[in-house]
Amino acid sequence: MAFASITFIAASRRRAVLLLPLLLASLPAAAHSELRRSVPAAGAVLMQAPEQMELHFNERVQLTALRLYRDGSEEISLPRRAIRSATTEIIALPPLPPGAYRAEWRIISADGHPAGGVIPFRIEAPKRP
């Protein structure tokens, strides 16, 4: 009986060793491009309008779209990118009045996967004394 148990355990281990590479190969890659930080930051409340928007990624990306909306629906026209590096995009912004904003971005990562996100922020009207 002990011999049968040992044989069964050995056979199970062999199957596990043979199946493990197949299981690992079928898992999706976990390390995709991600936005590390932005200026303005998501959820920021600003007392003055930013002059530029910065997107900092964890790896080389290609920015395919950046759209800025004010108060939910009004799209703000953005100029071409001001500065670009492998992992950073800096975009000059036009003068922005107070209000709620939403920046929507899309990228293609170095491994070809698309990704995107939303950065909401708010510009407050200056306080009057």
Regions found by a protein language model. Give the residues of each.
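Short proline/glycine-enriched turn/loop motifs at strand-loop junctions of beta-rich domains
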Residues: N58-L63
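N-terminal signal peptide c-region/cleavage motif recognized by signal peptidases
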Residues: S26-P28
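Short strand-edge motifs at loop-to-beta-strand transitions and within beta-strands
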Residues: T87-I91
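A glycine-anchored, Pro-Gly-centered beta-turn/N-cap motif
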Residues: A92, P97-A103
